[in-house]
Amino acid sequence: MTMMDMNFKYCHKIMKKHSKSFSYAFDLLPEDQRKAVWAIYAVCRKIDDSIDVYGDIQFLNQIKEDIQSIEKYPYEHHHFQSDRRIMMALQHVAQHKNIAFQSFYNLIDTVYKDQHFTMFETDAELFGYCYGVAGTVGEVLTPILSDHETHQTYDVARRLGESLQLINILRDVGEDFENERIYFSKQRLKQYEVDIAEVYQNGVNNHYIDLWEYYAAIAEKDFRDVMDQIKVFSIEAQPIIELAARIYIEILDEVRQASYTLHERVFVYKRKKAKLFHEINSKYHRI
C-alpha cells in the first residue's frame, strides 16, 4: 500500500465513522470516484468539527489556508498545517478533477458564523444555512459524480445537499435543543404556535407535528425533484446517489414511527438499507 493509499484509507475511516449511510452508498462507486468522495467528505468533516468539536478557530484558519494552497499550486509540495493526510488526498483529487474551491470557502464562512449562533428569523435564513453547510458539499462533489458539470448538475447536487441537511435538522431536534440550538425559524414557530422547550419537557403535540411535517414536506419535494433529474449525474453515480438519498429520506419515516420523539435519535437499520440496495440494484441492474 502506497502512502497515498494510506491517506485515502484514513479519509475513508473518517467517513465510515461519521456517516454510515454515505459510506454504505458511496463505497460502491468505482475506485477513483469513491476515493475522491472520501477525501472531500473528510475535508468537510474537519471543517465542521473545527469549531463544534475542537473549538479551535486557528485550526479552521489552517484548513482554509491549506485549501487555498492546493487551489493556487495543485502540483507543488506543501507543508500542510491542518491535517496532512487529508490535505494530501485532496491535493491528489484536485490534480485530476475540477474542484469547486469556492464552495469549500462558503462552507468555512458558514462555520465561522455558526460560532455565534442565533435563531433564524425566517425560513430564508434557515435554507441559507442549509446551503452553507450542505449545499456547498453537493457542489464540491459535482465534478466527481458527473461526466460534464453544467449549471443544472450543480443546482441538483446543491438541492440534494440542502434536502439532506434539512432531514438532519428534523432528526436532531431534541439533541440540538440540548445543545442550545433551535434551527426551525422564529417565523414558522410562531405560525404553528410551537415552543420547543415546552415540547421537549411535556411531549409532542399536534402543533409540533404539523410544524415538523411542514419542513418534512419541503425535504421530500426536493428529494423528488432531484430524483426526477438524476440523469444529470454519471451513469456510475446515479444508482449510488439514489441509494444515499433513499436511505436518508427513510430517516423521516423513522422519526414518524418513533412518534416524533425529541429524546431519541433514530437511524435506518441495516436490514432496511439492504432492502433499498436490492431495490435500486434491480432498477439499474448494475450496482
UniProtKB/Swiss-Prot annotation:
GO biological processes: carotenoid biosynthetic process
Binding of (2E,6E)-farnesyl diphosphate 1, residues: H18, S19, K20, S21, Y41, R45, R171, Y248
Annotated Mg(2+) 2 binding sites: N168, D172
Binding site for (2E,6E)-farnesyl diphosphate 2: R45, Q165
Catalytic activity: 2 (2E,6E)-farnesyl diphosphate = 15-cis-4,4'-diapophytoene + 2 diphosphate
Pathway(s) per entry: Carotenoid biosynthesis; staphyloxanthin biosynthesis; staphyloxanthin from farnesyl diphosphate: step 1/5
Keywords per UniProt: Carotenoid biosynthesis, Magnesium, Metal-binding, Transferase, Virulence
Residue positions binding Mg(2+) 1: D48, D52
EC assignment: 2.5.1.96
UniProt xrefs under SUPFAM superfamilies: Terpenoid synthases (SSF48576)
Cofactor dependence: Mg(2+)
Family annotation (Pfam families): SQS_PSY
A GO molecular-function descriptor: geranylgeranyl diphosphate synthase activity
Cofactor comment: Binds 2 Mg(2+) ions per subunit.
Superkingdom field: Bacteria
Role played: Involved in the biosynthesis of the yellow-orange carotenoid staphyloxanthin, which plays a role in the virulence via its protective function against oxidative stress. Catalyzes the head-to-head condensation of two molecules of farnesyl diphosphate (FPP) into the colorless C(30) carotenoid 4,4'-diapophytoene (dehydrosqualene).
Family under the similarity heading: Belongs to the phytoene/squalene synthase family. CrtM subfamily.
Protein name (record): 4,4'-diapophytoene synthase
Organism name: Staphylococcus aureus (strain bovine RF122 / ET3-1)
Gene name per UniProt: crtM
